[in-house]
Amino acid sequence: YFEKFTENNCVGIIYNEVEALSKLTGDYNFTNLCAATSLGLYFGIDFHLIKKAIEEYTPTNMRSQIVKKGDKTLVLDTYNANPSSMKVSLENFNDFIGTKTIIIGDMLELGEESVTEHSQILELAKSLSFDEIITVGPHFKEVNVSGVAFLTTQDLINYLTENEIHSQNILLKASRGIVLEKALEFIK
């Protein structure tokens, strides 16, 4: 009934041979497009109006928000982070074409499982094809002993004022409390 396609790292939906390309990344958002399209069609909305809505929607709430900075594409996903959302984000970002840097911040409120969960996410990140892995926060700093790790977002900002990230694609993913989005303006 619906088919998926991707273009420029964004996911789209095909219905009756008509394509609607969203500004959302990730296969997981295809499910959301299918649900929204199904509801619209159920209530009698013409697919061309649904297509227009899909193509015009721009995420602005730090949830898989795509930000262009010069020749770089940044994925700002700093509204929330937990082990399952971090895993999906990393796996999705791994499929991006071009060079890739991830800046991942702590997943808060994990309690006794924090060290284990941060270690597993770091190991997953290392197993994927990222050119650079940067971590932010005390939990990741504890487990990222041999990599680029910062205790705070301010420490990352201090680093970014002196150093450029050369990747074409950059993912920023963290829990809200890390306020990783503050680093966005310092990425050159």
Where are the model-predicted features located?
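A short, compositionally biased
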Residues: 4-12
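ATP-dependent carboxylate-amine ligase
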Residues: 8, 18-188
